[in-house]
């Protein structure tokens, strides 16, 4: 019996290695992604090495629940997350791989929508999906669809970004409002309704990073504050660089509805996940240039300078503190435990 992707759901045969698998690859994945390397049909995508001789590579797996949410779906996350991770090295992101684990019975129209979103987001980021894999597990063996992506980029000569580069006197910037993605996922999962529409911030930020590096070549580091939010990112920087950091709470951009939701749920917005924001640490003399570049870039219009890097007091441990609007300070710790499982 011949099957095709006119089937309304994913079947075990779509992962069999036979005719059904070839059809889902050809008619769902290749039709959407269609890079020359992928269309060759080999077990590996072959790509040119950069002239600089250095590459950056990252991989990430995506299990978000729900898989569709305001502002995106698991496919957009799968591209943006890995593109942004590679881009934090200062690399020009070039190629992605993608691996799908599909549950038997998953609706085919939803899979097509996810794949099409991935193709559109990859195009927006200027990257090619050059290799991939598909597996199908029995009903109950997965929750619909899981996606793994890996990315490769070319690191320009002379670029050496690292969370260990932060120095006292440096300035901390963020590219936009915090907490949007985490609150969207929580509201969708728990059936919470808000008076305004909050959308995930999932976005590819490789072009924004390139613009900031061009304007502020002394930039120390970038990082996307995903799980654990800004709190985890800054604590990681402080520990890697053996410094202290101070954040001006009033300077941190947060949507009023997101702030209200965090207060209602008992969350610290600085610990809530983001999927389309970037944290940068730059020398003080380049801070204005970096901020202008962020605000001029797509997805950076709400960028702000939010804090500074401080020297450690004698005998003190690396730490992050927040200066509140009341003039007091509090320690900003990394998230303890799991605030919201399957956020990405």
Where are these regions (language model features)?
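Helix N-cap motif at beta-to-alpha junctions
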Residues: 282-288
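Short, acidic (Asp/Glu-rich) active-site segment that either coordinates a divalent metal cofactor
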Residues: 160-210, 231
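Glycine-rich phosphate/pyrophosphate-binding loop regions near the starts of catalytic domains
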Residues: 11, 19-174, 185, 194
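Short Gly/Ser/Thr- and Asp/Glu-enriched loop/turn motifs at secondary-structure junctions
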Residues: 41-42, 272-277
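Short amphipathic alpha-helices in soluble, non-transmembrane regions
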Residues: 289-299
């Amino acid at each position: 019996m011949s099957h095709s992707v006119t089937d309304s759901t994913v079947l075990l045969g779509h992962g069999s290695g036979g005719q059904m698998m070839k059809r889902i690859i050809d008619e769902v994945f290749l039709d959407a992604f269609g890079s020359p390397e992928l269309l060759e049909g080999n077990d590996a995508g072959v790509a040119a090495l950069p002239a600089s001789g250095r590459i950056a590579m990252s991989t990430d797996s995506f299990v978000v629940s729900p898989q569709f949410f305001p502002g995106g779906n698991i496919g957009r996350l799968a591209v943006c997350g890995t593109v942004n991770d590679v881009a934090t090295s200062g690399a020009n992101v070039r190629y992605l791989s993608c691996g799908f684990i599909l549950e038997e019975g998953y609706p085919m129209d939803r899979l097509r929508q996810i794949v099409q979103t991935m193709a559109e987001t990859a195009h927006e980021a200027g990257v090619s999906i050059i290799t991939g894999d598909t597996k199908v597990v029995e009903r109950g063996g997965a929750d619909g669809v899981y996606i793994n992506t890996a990315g490769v980029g070319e690191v320009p000569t002379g670029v050496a970004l690292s969370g260990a580069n932060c120095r006292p006197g440096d300035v901390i910037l963020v590219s936009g409002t915090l907490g949007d993605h985490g609150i969207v996922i929580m509201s969708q999962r728990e059936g919470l309704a808000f008076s305004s529409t909050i959308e995930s911030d999932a976005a590819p930020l490789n072009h924004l990073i390139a613009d900031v590096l061009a304007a502020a070549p002394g930039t120390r580091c970038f990082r996307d504050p995903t799980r654990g939010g800004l709190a985890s990112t800054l604590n990681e920087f402080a520990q890697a660089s053996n410094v202290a950091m101070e954040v001006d709470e009033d300077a941190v951009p947060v949507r009023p509805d997101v702030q209200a939701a965090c207060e209602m749920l008992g969350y610290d917005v600085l610990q809530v996940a983001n999927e389309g924001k970037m944290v940068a640490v730059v020398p003080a003399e380049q801070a204005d240039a970096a901020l202008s570049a962020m605000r001029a870039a797509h997805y950076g219009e709400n960028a702000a300078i939010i804090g500074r890097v401080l020297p450690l007091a004698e005998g003190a441990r690396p730490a992050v503190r927040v200066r509140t609007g009341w003039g007091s300070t509090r320690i900003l710790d990394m998230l303890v435990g799991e605030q919201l499982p399957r956020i990405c």
